[in-house]
């Protein structure tokens, strides 16, 4: 019952909050201008931008240059961190390949961690590298999404200014909400300190080092920005990051808020005046929520069903391996599905210990990469499936393929298909390389089907910019650091460039057909068609390899 109440409440909050995002996205005046305008203007002066509207090509150039500069600075700081200040625990520099992976991971909003949070980075790099990139990577995804929506909806005839979009989102959305969430987490017991690790003597007489630090400030943006990188190696399964059920709900709600609000924002932009959400966006929301609930049901059923091997021994009950007793199987399954649907990657349980079908659920969500998804980018990926559905359905019934009164032509379809293919190609090709390259498969710690699942999950998590993992995999090696780094880089930037190209190409076309010659995108049957095409297209792509992994493990586990 508490899960139903929580999900209902988050949908309502996201719907209301999308109205505020509408004013932020369209640079409309609001009551908070007096608070934020001066700070924004100061940021614009520091950046040196004149706030002139950019072309799509210029927008992408500045987006890539901004991200490239941040990535370079991050890489340098990680390989020299031991010689800098705010390192009371004397943590060492990262190796070249690990720093490459870490920099790309946080730059692309993936937060895939091949290092231990306690010893792999210093307080300085946690705050000015990890936390900073959690803000900017999230805001970058939002900015390019808003640029795409401005073009698709035709609400304005400009694409916007990249620096204005990213600064306004950080100042007016991320910073205020992060401060609020940090305070709420601190009230629940999440630490926020610059003191060195505690050294205590246990009851058995041994010396124990307890790691903590500025956790609350990172924890808030980690979930709000759908980042996922943990301050500690155990991530949100540790009491210092996620002490109790209330902090658990706060963190899950933080993950869901902005991606769901972005979908409602799209609906408000379609309705022109922003007072209501267009029916088309509501259809998309219901379709995605249906898939979300279906995967959640599968995961919870599998986890509550438990391990059949233990059942044969007379030990019945839910699967509690790798789970925190304070959360149990139910909230652990909910957190797992939310963190993979919204591509956050934080965990409150160990995904490697999930049952076969329990691990299949989050893996499928990352393979789809459209069920709400991350900040902005998730909606952009969903719109690619929407365009595919419109094109195929239109041709099936003999109507003109148009979306929002814009004809979909051969040029757009080439880009759409390329965006669709990038994701599975990266996952499947690099997974195959993991078994072909000598030494790479030595990182696998489980034989047979589950070992294949470990590899598939790691590559899928990198391609979806998620960051969670089957952590039985020994992934801090040269192969895994370089391969997943390349995957995260390509899967982030190539689709974004193509998606903005698609939007700019569509907006230059005008429809010469009446509504009766095009399919209706605001009817329930379109939502059903969208679900069917998502399942069919992804199923044909990934079912063979899933049979070798979690499905095969499920069928043989007796």
Curated annotation (Swiss-Prot):
GO molecular function, one term: potassium ion binding
Membrane recorded as keyword: yes
Self-association and partners: The system is composed of three essential subunits: KdpA, KdpB and KdpC.
Membrane topology: Multi-pass membrane protein
Keyword Cytoplasm among record annotations: no
One GO location term (cellular component): plasma membrane
Known role: Part of the high-affinity ATP-driven potassium transport (or Kdp) system, which catalyzes the hydrolysis of ATP coupled with the electrogenic transport of potassium into the cytoplasm. This subunit binds the extracellular potassium ions and delivers the ions to the membrane domain of KdpB through an intramembrane tunnel.
Sequence similarity: Belongs to the KdpA family.
Cell compartment(s), UniProt: Cell membrane
Transmembrane annotation, as ranges: 1-21, 66-86, 127-147, 166-186, 245-265, 281-301, 327-347, 354-374, 377-397, 416-436, 482-502, 531-551
Protein name (Swiss-Prot/TrEMBL): Potassium-transporting ATPase potassium-binding subunit
Entries under HAMAP family matching the protein: KdpA
Keywords (A to Z) from UniProt: Cell membrane, Ion transport, Membrane, Potassium, Potassium transport, Transmembrane, Transmembrane helix, Transport
Gene: kdpA
């Amino acid at each position: 019952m508490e899960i139903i109440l929580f999900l209902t409440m988050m949908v309502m909050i996201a719907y209301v909050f999308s109205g505020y995002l509408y004013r932020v996205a369209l640079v409309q005046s609001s009551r908070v201008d007096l608070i934020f305008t001066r700070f924004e203007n100061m940021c614009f002066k520091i950046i040196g931008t004149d706030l002139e509207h950019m072309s799509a090509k210029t927008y992408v150039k500045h987006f890539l240059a901004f991200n490239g500069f941040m990535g370079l600075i991050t890489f340098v700081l990680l390989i020299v961190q031991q010689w800098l200040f705010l390192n009371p625990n004397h943590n060492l520099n990262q190796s070249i390949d690990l720093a490459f992976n870490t920099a790309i991971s946080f730059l692309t909003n993936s937060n895939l961690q091949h290092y231990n949070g306690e010893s792999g980075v210093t307080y300085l790099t946690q705050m000015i590298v990890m936390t900073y990139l959690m803000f900017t990577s999230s805001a970058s995804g939002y900015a390019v999404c808003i640029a795409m929506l401005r073009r698709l909806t035709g609400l304005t005839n400009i694409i916007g200014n990249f620096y204005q979009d990213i600064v306004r989102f950080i100042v007016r959305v991320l910073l205020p909400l992060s401060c609020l969430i940090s305070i709420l987490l601190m009230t629940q017991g999440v630490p926020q300190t610059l003191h060195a690790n505690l050294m205590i003597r246990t009851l058995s007489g041994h010396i124990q080092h307890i790691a903590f630090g500025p956790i609350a400030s990172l924890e808030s943006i980690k979930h709000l920005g759908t980042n996922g990188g943990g301050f500690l190696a155990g991530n949100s399964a540790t009491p210092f990051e996620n002490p109790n059920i209330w902090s658990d709900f706060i963190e899950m709600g933080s993950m869901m808020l902005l991606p769901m609000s972005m979908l409602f924002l799209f609906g408000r932009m379609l309705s022109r005046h922003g007072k209501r959400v267009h029916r088309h966006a509501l259809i998309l929301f219901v379709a995605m929520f249906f898939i979300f609930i279906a995967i959640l049901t599968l995961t919870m059923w599998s986890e509550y069903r438990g391990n059949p091997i233990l059942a044969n021994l007379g030990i019945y009950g839910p699967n509690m391996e790798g789970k925190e007793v304070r959360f149990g199987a139910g909230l652990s399954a909910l957190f797992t599905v939310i963190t993979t649907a919204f591509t956050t990657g934080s965990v409150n349980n160990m995904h490697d210990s999930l049952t076969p079908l329990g691990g299949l659920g989050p893996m499928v969500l990352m393979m789809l990469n459209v069920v709400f998804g991350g900040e902005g980018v998730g909606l952009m990926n969903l719109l690619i499936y929407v365009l595919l559905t419109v094109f195929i359905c239109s041709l099936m019934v003999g109507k003109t393929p148009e979306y929002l009164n814009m004809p979909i032509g051969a040029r757009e379809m080439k880009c759409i298909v390329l965006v669709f293919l990038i994701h599975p190609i990266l996952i499947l090709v690099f997974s195959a390389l993991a078994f072909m390259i000598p030494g790479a498969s030595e990182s696998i710690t489980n034989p047979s089907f589950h070992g294949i699942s470990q590899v598939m999950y790691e590559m899928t998590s990198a391609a979806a910019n998620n960051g969670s993992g089957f952590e039985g995999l020994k992934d801090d090696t040269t192969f895994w650091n370089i391969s997943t780094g390349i995957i995260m880089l390509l899967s982030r930037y190539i689709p974004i460039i193509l998606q903005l190209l698609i939007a700019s190409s569509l907006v230059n076309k005008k429809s010469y057909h009446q509504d009766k010659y095009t399919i209706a995108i605001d009817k329930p049957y379109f939502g059903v068609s969208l679900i069917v095409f998502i399942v069919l297209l992804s199923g044909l792509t990934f079912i063979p390899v899933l049979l070798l992994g979690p499905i095969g493990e499920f069928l043989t586990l007796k």
